[in-house]
Regions:
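Conserved, mostly hydrophobic/aromatic
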Residues: 67, 141, 168, 259, ...
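C-terminal beta-strand-rich structural cap/linker in extracellular carbohydrate-active enzymes
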Residues: 362-390
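Conserved structural scaffold segments of CAZyme catalytic domains across common CAZy folds
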Residues: 1-106, 379-380
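Glycan-recognition and catalytic regions of carbohydrate-active enzymes
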Residues: 269-316, 352-356
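Solvent-exposed beta-strand/loop surfaces of large extracellular or lumenal domains
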Residues: 344-368
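Aromatic- and carboxylate-enriched substrate-binding clefts and catalytic-loop regions
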Residues: 78-249
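Catalytic domains of carbohydrate-active enzymes that cleave complex glycans
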Residues: 243, 252-265, 271
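Carbohydrate-binding surface patches
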Residues: 300-341, 381-382
Length: 390
């Protein structure tokens, strides 16, 4: 059980991480973190293309080009790139040799989805194949248990991946609770009701999203996969299969990339839609996934949270709001001395009706400033602070 004097004492608590066994004494310097794209949540429902979108080489080259343009490190090849029961039976129309060559040329990494039972059966041979392709990260899915036999599977797979210098994300998984300390190549666990639930349910509400920061996040990195670009207020929302929307504003989706802790972040938005808004995507693409300092500035469980995270000399400030609109006044004293160029992305004047509405502005600030921000219902904001050279 974790304790804090205030709600905001809990989200940055790392006790469960520290309770994990220390990692084995081996070289972990090969591990790389970053941001990737996912195509499964939006059903590869792309547009403005000269080819038919789907599980084919041209589509994934399109994702690679997008990632390279907007500062992403990798793209996901989610379920379907191979037969779920045989990782060596590649989907017709997918030329993996060409895709891996093209990805290397563009300096983008490929991340592969696997079915956990298949990965276990083909573990060594599959990891050898992934090494030959230059794959550095995989996802394995549908464990859906936490008995001792399954816990042993997690350790067995993490160890084998480490031996092959491959990082891994566990989906359909129990929370890490220090597992990522024991195995640093285990970047994140899903273990959360995240973006994909917008496809078929009304469960990922703004209040739910805020509550995650005070509950699930305490157990370690989580893979929510935010970034849906079709946004709606609660009374406008409905699940729409391959064209999913969020029950929150565009800026609420953006703020999750800083609010939620995960050294591997996955953008789930439709990249054809994202290409129409380059300024927004350049800001999203700039967000780091690892941090040197974290401060929870303000918040109340299930209602809202304001988080500041530092990466090098720069800071990112994010606010995630529940279903009730609110006005915030946020001290910037965490910035310390000097001036910063602030890029502010916040709910637009009409976000209470049109949830995709947002505004972008830039100004110079310092640690003496208080920032005033209005959150629409289901709202959010993100501020990037870049240190100005004196």
């Amino acid at each position: 059980m974790l304790f804090g004097k205030k709600d905001i004492d809990l989200p940055a608590n790392d006790l469960l991480y520290l309770l994990g066994d220390a990692p084995a004494s081996r070289d972990w310097s090969w591990i790389r973190y970053g941001k990737g794209t996912d195509e499964w949540i939006t059903g590869i429902n792309l547009f403005n293309l000269p080819f038919e979108a789907g599980l084919n080489t041209n589509t994934y080259k399109y994702y690679i080009d997008f990632a390279a343009r907007f500062g992403f490190d990798q793209i996901m090849l989610d379920a379907g790139w191979s037969d779920a029961r045989d990782l060596f039976r590649i989907q017709p129309g997918m030329d993996m040799e060409e895709l891996t060559r093209y990805a290397r040329e563009k300096k983008i990494r490929l991340m592969l989805w696997t079915l956990s039972s298949t990965l276990e059966r083909q573990l060594d041979s599959a990891l050898n194949l992934f090494n030959r392709w230059g794959i550095e990260t995989i996802m394995t899915d549908f464990m859906d248990r936490d008995d001792q036999e399954m816990v042993n599977f997690y350790h067995r797979v993490a160890r084998a991946c480490a031996d092959h210098h491959i990082a891994i994300m566990f989906h359909g998984a129990y929370p890490p609770k220090g597992f990522n300390r024991t195995w640093p190549n285990v970047l994140t666990h899903e273990s959360v009701l995240g973006s994909e639930w917008n496809i078929w349910s009304e469960l990922p509400t703004p209040d739910h999203n805020v509550a995650i920061a005070y509950t699930r996040m305490l157990a370690g990195p989580l893979d929510y996969e935010p970034g849906l670009l079709l946004n709606a207020q609660r009374d406008q929302f409905r699940p729409i299969g391959k064209n999913p929307m969020s029950q929150s504003t565009r800026c609420h989706q953006l703020a999750m990339f800083v609010t939620y802790d995960s050294p591997l972040q996955i953008f789930s938005g439709n990249i054809s839609q994202a290409l129409l808004e380059p300024a927004f995507m350049e800001l999203l693409g700039s967000i780091p996934t690892t941090w040197t300092d974290t401060k929870i500035i303000d918040g109340k469980t299930g209602e809202y949270i304001v988080t500041a995270r530092q990466h090098g000399d720069d800071w990112y400030l994010a606010g995630l709001g529940g279903s009730t609109a609110r006005d915030l006044e946020i001290p910037l004293d965490f910035l310390g001395a000097g001036d910063y160029e602030a890029t502010i992305c916040k709910d637009g004047r009409n976000a209470h009706n049109y949830a995709a509405d947002y505004s972008l502005e830039r100004l110079t600030v310092n640690g003496q400033v208080w920032l005033k921000i209005h959150l629409a219902p289901g709202g959010g904001f993100l501020v990037q602070f870049r240190k100005k050279q004196s």
